[in-house]
C-alpha cells in the first residue's frame, strides 16, 4: 500500500442513496490565456457506512478500492455540519 493516501475536502450535494453520498470537490484552475483563476467542480460518489452525512456538510473523503461502478471514495470524517 502506498504511503500517500489521497484525501480531499468537499461538500455533500446529495445523500438520497443508502450508505452513499455525492461530494462536490472545488478546485481553482488558472485560465490558460487570461490568467484568471476559475472555480472547477468535480462530483464523486463516496461510501457513508452509517448514513450520518446530510446535504451541505463539509466532509473529508479518501480514495479506496472500487466499491461499485462509480464509488471509489469513502468517508473519513465530517469536518463541519451544515447550518439548518
UniProtKB/Swiss-Prot annotation:
One of its GO terms (molecular function) is rRNA binding. Belongs to the universal ribosomal protein uS17 family. One of the primary rRNA binding proteins, it binds specifically to the 5'-end of 16S ribosomal RNA. Part of the 30S ribosomal subunit. Keywords: Ribonucleoprotein, Ribosomal protein, RNA-binding, rRNA-binding. Gene3D superfamilies: Nucleic acid-binding proteins. The gene is rpsQ. The keyword Ribonucleoprotein applies. This is Small ribosomal subunit protein uS17. GO terms for biological process: translation. One of its GO terms (cellular component) is cytosolic small ribosomal subunit. InterPro entries: NA-bd_OB-fold (IPR012340), Ribosomal_uS17 (IPR000266), Ribosomal_uS17_bact/chlr (IPR019984), Ribosomal_uS17_CS (IPR019979).
